[in-house]
């Protein structure tokens, strides 16, 4: 959605702000990413899935709205640097094994798929209703979430 809408905040932090990345996108992405890590590297999903996603999502909702993309890049970079420096952390030093239950894998994946489909349908219907191009226009400019991000960061 409208990558041209990304800008640098005007405050002293100079954060990268993407106001069109509202809560629905963040939650849909988080669910998709957790489902991926849970299904593909399940014994690491607590660290590289849940905790890593929460570390960028919590600040987005409670500290700096609109900066999720920057928070994600920073936390992912820190995690990768840490895990490359201490590769045995997730496997031997502090393992958190999962059940490897196929039903749990399916439920997490199905929930992720359902939420992401709802997000896509919402995004396309909003774009169509407001005659916006999803590749270059900001889609959510009329939403309260978008307006709040703009108000806090301009």
Predicted regions and their residues:
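C-terminal transmembrane-bundle signature of multipass membrane proteins
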Residues: 48-153
């Amino acid at each position: 959605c409208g990558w041209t809408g990304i800008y640098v905040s005007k405050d002293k932090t100079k954060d990268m702000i993407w106001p069109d990345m509202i809560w629905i996108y963040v939650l849909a992405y988080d669910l998709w990413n957790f489902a991926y890590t849970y299904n593909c590297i399940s014994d690491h999903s607590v660290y590289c899935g849940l905790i890593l996603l929460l570390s960028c999502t919590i600040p987005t909702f409670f500290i700096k709205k609109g900066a999720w993309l920057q928070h994600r890049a920073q936390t992912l970079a820190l995690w990768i640097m840490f895990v490359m420096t201490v590769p045995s952390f997730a496997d031997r030093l502090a393992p958190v094994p999962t059940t490897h239950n196929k039903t749990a894998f399916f439920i997490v994946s199905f929930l992720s798929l359902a939420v992401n489909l709802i997000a896509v349908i919402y995004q396309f219907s909003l774009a169509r209703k407001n005659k916006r191009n999803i590749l270059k226009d900001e889609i959510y400019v009329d939403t309260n979430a978008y307006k709040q991000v703009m108000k806090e960061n301009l």
